[in-house]
Amino acid sequence: MLVVLFTVALLALSSAQGPREELQNQIQIPNQRPPPSGSQPRPPVNGSQQGPPPPGGPQPRPPQGPPPPGGPQPRPPQGPPPPGGPQPRPPQGPPPPGGPQPRPPQGPPPPGGPQPRPPQGPPPPGGPQPRPPQGPPPPGGPQQRPPQGPPPPGGPQPRPPQGPPPPAGPQPRPPQGPPPPAGPHLRPTQGPPPTGGPQQRYPQSPPPPGGPQPRPPQGPPPPGGPHPRPTQGPPPTGPQPRPTQGPPPTGGPQQRPPQGPPPPGGPQPRPPQGPPPPTGPQPRPTQGPHPTGGPQQTPPLAGNPQGPPQGRPQGPQ
């Protein structure tokens, strides 16, 4: 590079010196020519000046000569700048390698990126872990549902009290006595049930011996309590399953006929019995578990309404 710069500078200087010598020779020639007489008219032709001014005119010309060498001087710096230009270009060359250097770091970041992705990979297994807990909750749910299953048996127990509320039906029985006109209104609705209802009522009269026995079957029904639920829908039909208890009713109806005469007075005591039945049904569900002991209590209860009711209505009569 330095050699090139020197050569360029020498060439510029030599080229500048060449015109300088030519200019000097030309200047010397006009300087020598002015002395002749013919030279005077020539100067005005060249510079439109007289003889004396020409010598001054060439003086400004020589300064014009030197400026050219000054001009080439800036040119030589122009020469070196080109080599200087390539110098910045080589740095441009290295920057590309520098550029790839940042790119390689970009390369490693991708591996860093996959690292977070692998954690993303494991999270999915972590995700399924919470899902498995979701899986077990369903079994936990069924655990609660089983308790829901048993409650139905418990539910049927209160529902059996709902069954006894029909015994609250004795309230319609009082209407059987004097208010038959109003009773029929209820009876038509209970029309179908009366057939089964009386059957239940009959077993209630003899239940002391066998009535409690149908109640124990009510005890097992709790698991089938759902069955009493459908019977609850058509309570009239509910008495129909109790008609299955009807075999005891066969004897019960015989007692009910005697109940027929007492109803006029019997219904009056029975209405008070009507309100208690709701409380009565509660002990009756307890009678379900204690069917054996329950019947003992119920027989006197049922026997009292059977025998004494006749006497009691006789009293009010």
UniProtKB/Swiss-Prot annotation:
Domain of life: Eukaryota
Residues of the signal peptide: 1-16
Keyword Oxidoreductase applies: no
Location of the region described as Disordered in the Swiss-Prot/TrEMBL record: 15-317
InterPro entries: Pro-rich (IPR026086)
Start-end of Pro residues biased regions: 32-44, 51-183, 204-288, 306-317
Protein name: Proline-rich protein 2
Residue stretches spanning the membrane: none
Coiled coil regions, renumbered to chain: none
Protein localization: Secreted
Keywords: Glycoprotein, Repeat, Secreted, Signal
Record-level GO cellular component terms: extracellular region
Main subcellular localisation: secreted
Glycosylated residues in this chain: N46
Biased composition (Low complexity): 289-305
